[in-house]
């Protein structure tokens, strides 16, 4: 057994030298091919160049099936195959082994986000509703906010104000809530790199803000302008009782402060800021669900987040298209995506740009909201 361990260590060293930037995917019959393929695609989309499919014994057929599936879909190509026949003291027998070395296909696009986690709203008569009247799962909806941190004004921010006011919310209080929470987030994270920033909670928020059950904020230090930390910041609030359409599953609002195009000299810098904001959004969503899973807060899991085209209208850079903004949002979300805590992502209709961006950047299938695969 000790010899097998030494041989494995030696082989791993050889693999790292011959195939830099590689990941070993252990193939087991305890996992479905669908799960293994999704994992392989996520690794490739995340920057891995080589996938090494490794299986023993009864996993060999599954290993070959996985290789064939990845190759047929232009995800990866075979560069090397190794077979082995090793003796294991644990069962006093020889076991066949297989390693299939695959390199990312040059035409591979893909996404770290599982296709089953993404859906798109169909074209509405006017606008995609902020919340459905009969939701079948717990959902939060993104509000494209601004640097003043108020709820109201124009576009979807005005629609949020109207909807929440109609259900009894004191919408004017959200601005002071967000400013207090932002101040706390900045104080606790001002010297940290973005990947070290922690989401902060407003303790006992319902005492001062009775419409709110929970309030969370995550800042994006790289987008700070002078003393202004608002750009790129994300706020999650869950409602205490006054739910939109009187449905408890319409659980909360996600207030996102996207970048303003007029504040950027180049369209590239603007789109980079959109990308960073979307990454921060996804991280905040995962942080919330992570707190729920670890029972650090007694709240329900957010099953779905409906996402609008923030920074894609009045705030859009004059040289950027809506499709450019949608691509940056999708790519940013993919960077922050974590399969376990991430909610499903439902994209509001906006000239079909989210669906077009998904197909163009990933080449993957699409789903309509509350519809079967098309």
Curated annotation (Swiss-Prot):
Belongs to the histone-like Alba family. Its main location: cytoplasm. It is found in: Cytoplasm; Cytoplasm, Cell cortex; Cytoplasm, Perinuclear region. Possesses DNA- and RNA-binding activities. Binds to DNA with relaxed sequence specificity. May associate with the subtelomeric TARE6 repeats. Regulates the abundance of transcript sub-populations in a stage-specific manner. Regulates activation of male gametocytes. Participates in the coordination of sporozoite development in the oocyst. GO terms for cellular component: cell cortex; perinuclear region of cytoplasm. This is DNA/RNA-binding protein ALBA4. Keywords: Cytoplasm, DNA-binding, RNA-binding. The keyword Transmembrane helix does not apply. GO terms for molecular function: DNA binding; RNA binding. Disruption phenotype: In sexual stage gametocytes, genetic disruption causes a significant increase in the number of activated male gametes with no differences in total gametocytemia, sex ratio and mature-immature gametocyte ratio. Typical coordinated arrival of the sporozoites to the salivary gland from the midgut is affected. No significant differences in the prevalence of mosquito infection, oocyst numbers and total number of sporozoites per infected mosquito. No significant growth defects in asexual blood stages. It comes from the Eukaryota. InterPro entries: Alba-like_dom_sf (IPR036882). The lineage of its organism: Eukaryota, Sar, Alveolata, Apicomplexa, Aconoidasida.
């Amino acid at each position: 057994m000790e010899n097998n361990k030494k041989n494995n260590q030696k082989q791993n060293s050889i693999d790292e030298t011959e195939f830099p930037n590689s990941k070993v995917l252990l193939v087991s019959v305890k996992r479905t091919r669908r799960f293994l393929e999704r994992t392989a695609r996520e690794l490739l989309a995340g920057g891995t160049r080589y996938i090494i499919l490794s299986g023993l014994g009864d996993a060999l057929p599954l290993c070959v099936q996985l290789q064939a599936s990845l190759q047929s879909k232009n995800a990866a190509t075979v560069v090397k195959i190794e077979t082995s026949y090793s003796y294991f003291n644990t069962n006093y027998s020889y076991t066949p082994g297989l390693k299939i070395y695959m390199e990312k296909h040059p035409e591979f696009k893909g996404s770290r986000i599982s296709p089953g986690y993404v859906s798109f709203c169909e074209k509405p008569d006017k606008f995609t509703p902020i919340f459905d009247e009969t939701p079948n799962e717990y959902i939060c909806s993104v509000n494209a906010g601004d640097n003043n941190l108020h709820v109201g004004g124009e576009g979807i921010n005005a629609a949020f104000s109207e909807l929440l006011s109609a259900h009894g919310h004191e919408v004017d209080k959200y601005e002071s809530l967000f400013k207090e929470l932002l101040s706390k987030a900045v104080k606790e994270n001002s010297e940290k790199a973005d990947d070290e920033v922690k989401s902060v909670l407003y303790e006992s928020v319902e005492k001062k803000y009775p419409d709110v059950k929970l309030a969370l904020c995550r800042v994006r230090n790289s987008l700070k302008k002078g003393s202004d930390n608002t750009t790129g910041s994300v706020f999650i609030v869950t409602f205490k009782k006054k739910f939109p359409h009187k449905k408890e599953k319409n659980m909360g609002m996600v207030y996102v402060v996207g970048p303003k195009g007029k504040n950027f000299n180049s369209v590239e810098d603007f789109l980079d800021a959109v990308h960073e904001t979307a990454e921060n959004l996804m991280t905040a969503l995962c942080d919330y669900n992570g707190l729920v899973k670890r029972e650090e807060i007694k709240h329900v899991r957010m099953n779905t987040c409906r996402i609008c085209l923030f920074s894609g209208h009045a705030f859009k850079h004059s040289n950027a298209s809506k499709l450019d903004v949608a691509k940056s949002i999708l790519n940013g979300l993919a960077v922050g995506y974590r399969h376990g805590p991430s909610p499903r992502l439902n994209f509001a209709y906006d000239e079909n740009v989210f669906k077009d961006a998904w197909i163009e950047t990933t080449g993957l299938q699409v789903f309509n909201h509350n519809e079967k695969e098309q």
